[in-house]
Amino acid sequence: KIQKPEHIKLIPELFKEAGYFTCLGSSGHAAGIASGKQKNRFGKSDYNFEWDPKVFDAPEWSDRKQGQPFFAKICLSGGKARSQARSSKDIPHVKSADVKLPPYYPRHPVVLEDWAAYLDTFSLMDFQVGQIVDRLKKEGEFENTVIFFITDHGVSHARGKQFCYDEGMMIPFFVHAPSRVQAGTVRKEPVLHIDLAATSLYFAGIEIPKYMEARTLFGPDAVKRKFAVSARDRCDETYDRIRAVRTSRYKYIRNGYPNRPQLQPCAYKDNKDTYVAIRDWGEKGKLSDLQQNLLLSPKRAKEELYDLKNDPWE
């Protein structure tokens, strides 16, 4: 069991100490449509350390005191809900033939269909977010609520999730903060996941602990980052060591084990239909030289340097 240092507090813990009603739920909870056993079941909490579930009061904010502010972490199904998105009658659907793939992926029917289903999950998430926004508006809280929309990683493909290429590391980040952030503002400097912690505390007027490496993105103390650092080590049973530094234009990657292939054996990914399809076409000689080299080469370069303006696909 891994214990966090006693002096470090979880974000919901800091909010709770400040008088907030704290929530951990799913889109159904936040939209007010969860029922049955699901109604009282908390959202995803697969943290990698021991923690006290009491830092969260409920899956959603219905039971808070009159006028009590609330902090809610809402877990959407995201890109994992391909089947749900593909069969949903609430959203438009992408045709696999219309999919535009990164140049390093083959236009294999399985890959195209998977990517189309992945794009459908965007529409499903948009629909789910709309349900949550509708509830906030109905309750008169929308203009009084700061909302962050963020994902945990990129698409779970051969150069996406678990890797340091932009396909896995670059994620959407939207902020709704009435009277605090001007709508339509676009910022292009590097931002880290952890910055969400400091920014949340800043908007709530809660002191940001000095031990935090996170930076608030707004306010007089905001300092823009010049670069973002990322890493890959052990993923499931697969050992690796990759370090990367990205500025607004350049990406430098260093591979600690260049003698290992990009697609090392990994039980989590190896049975995915897309991986099977890519390997099948590789064995049959149907991949382009670029695809074969980037996906199925037995070795990697020790160092990689990309000009993202001229080579956005790395």
Residue ranges: model-predicted function:
Residues 1-304, 312-313:
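Formylglycine-dependent sulfatase
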